[in-house]
Amino acid sequence: MFQALSDGFKNALNKIRFQDDEKALDRALDELKKTLLKNDVHHKVARELLKKVESQTKAGGIGKQQFLDALEKSLLEILSAKGSSGFTFAQTPPTVVLMAGLQGSGKTTTTAKLAHYLKTKNKKVLLCACDLQRLAAVEQLKVLGEQVGVEVFHEENKSVKEIANNALKRAKEAQFDVLIVDSAGRLAIDKELMQELKEVKEVLNPHEVLYVADALSGQDGVKSANTFNEEIGVSGVVLSKFDSDSKGGIALGITYQLGLPLRFIGSGEKIPDLDVFMPERIVGRLMGAGDIISLAEKTASVLNPNEAKDLSKKLKKGQFTFNDFLNQIEKVKKLGSMSSLISMIPGLGNMASALKDTDLESSLEVKKIKAMVNSMTKKERENPEILNGSRRKRIALGSGLEVSEINRIIKRFDQASKMAKRLTNKKGISDLMNLMSQAKNQTPPKMR
């Protein structure tokens, strides 16, 4: 996920070696500029980000930590468009969602992923197949609907408007909570496509119009999203293929250039691989600190309520231990795609694309982590702060690793644990205890 962007941030940070060195800051900003432009970030967005980072770094006194804090804060400001994150339900069901996007963007698959996400929130979902342009699109949605376990409404020899209208009637009569309509896509934007979408929108009067954008499309994707927004009005954007080797330009462009909120990200090829877009967590991954909170939420379904409650308390206090970490790795193997999960683990973000089709168990880095943890005493696993030099040497000897590798893993773990504590206490983020206590058969938290 945006690995080139993340690597560029690290390179920029390494340009600053001494405190209060303005020339070093200039070199860091120059490196940052090159990174942004290379990763398809629009020059206006790049200019704004550089201006923010420079002023905030100087205000705090030039240094690595000040630069890091300024970059993190500036990225958050740009990615946090009003209305970002999650799903908004209508006051009176059904909530009607119109999915739009170009052919090949992953729109139909994303439609099924959204249905799965809502189903996990105990919502009754109806899918409607209105993509009559692409061969087998209806059949694809039927297959995906069967996998998710939701009803798919489809009709033959009817116009798109008639199908949409009948699906809406069905959703109301059968008391569905949500109706999601998969509209037709095109290889390129044309008048016929927009006219059809306008007609379907008029029939449905949807509460949400979600545009599915391919994360690999860069500035072209930003332009397409803008055209759809101008023609039919878009309430939010879903970035598909977010787990791929995509550039960061499209995410920054959609939020800053267009002011459109990012609602979800497709984090893998499997049906469960759809995550609510949370700027704080994405920035955490970009900065190389992983995302322990999302990792914890991913494992919530395989944790019993007591485990979930205990883990959430530890995260809030910054007391996430190596035992917890090892336990999550064992449980998380059952969930989602490897690439999406790997990017959440501290220090493994750059391995996500390489491990797309690889078992977590076979990862060399994970084997190193497990070897290190298994070479610790029970006290050391529960109290990472006591790992002094002599203990680290003993652990290195027992695990077959170099002391430098032990130091690197512990440093990454410590950074991620601190970030998790900071994020769980930020205003606007749901109480993690509520999220973690969402074990199976429990009432889901109230949504936006």
Swiss-Prot record:
State the Gene3D superfamilies in the record: P-loop containing nucleotide triphosphate hydrolases, Signal recognition particle SRP54, nucleotide-binding domain, Signal recognition particle, SRP54 subunit, M-domain
Where does the UniProt annotation locate this protein? Cytoplasm
Record InterPro entries? AAA+_ATPase, P-loop_NTPase, Signal_recog_part_SRP54_M_sf, Signal_recog_particl_SRP54_hlx, Signal_recog_particle_SRP54_M, SRP, SRP/SRP_N, SRP54
- Keyword Nucleotide-binding assigned: yes
Example of a GO cellular component annotation carried by this entry:
signal recognition particle
Where is the signal peptide, in residue numbers?
none
Indicate which residues the UniProt annotation says bind GTP. Answer: 101-108, 182-186, 240-243
- What CDD domains does this protein's entry cite? SRP_G
Annotated GO molecular function terms are:
7S RNA binding; ATP hydrolysis activity; GTP binding; GTPase activity
Pfam families cross-referenced by the UniProt entry? SRP54 (PF00448), SRP54_N (PF02881), SRP_SPB (PF02978)
- Catalytically driven reaction(s): GTP + H2O = GDP + phosphate + H(+)
Stated role: Involved in targeting and insertion of nascent membrane proteins into the cytoplasmic membrane. Binds to the hydrophobic signal sequence of the ribosome-nascent chain (RNC) as it emerges from the ribosomes. The SRP-RNC complex is then targeted to the cytoplasmic membrane where it interacts with the SRP receptor FtsY. Interaction with FtsY leads to the transfer of the RNC complex to the Sec translocase for insertion into the membrane, the hydrolysis of GTP by both Ffh and FtsY, and the dissociation of the SRP-FtsY complex into the individual components.
Quaternary structure annotation from Swiss-Prot or TrEMBL: Part of the signal recognition particle protein translocation system, which is composed of SRP and FtsY. SRP is a ribonucleoprotein composed of Ffh and a 4.5S RNA molecule.
What's this protein's name? Signal recognition particle protein
Source species of the chain: Helicobacter pylori (strain J99 / ATCC 700824) (Campylobacter pylori J99)
Q: What is the lineage of its organism?
A: Bacteria, Pseudomonadati, Campylobacterota, Epsilonproteobacteria, Campylobacterales
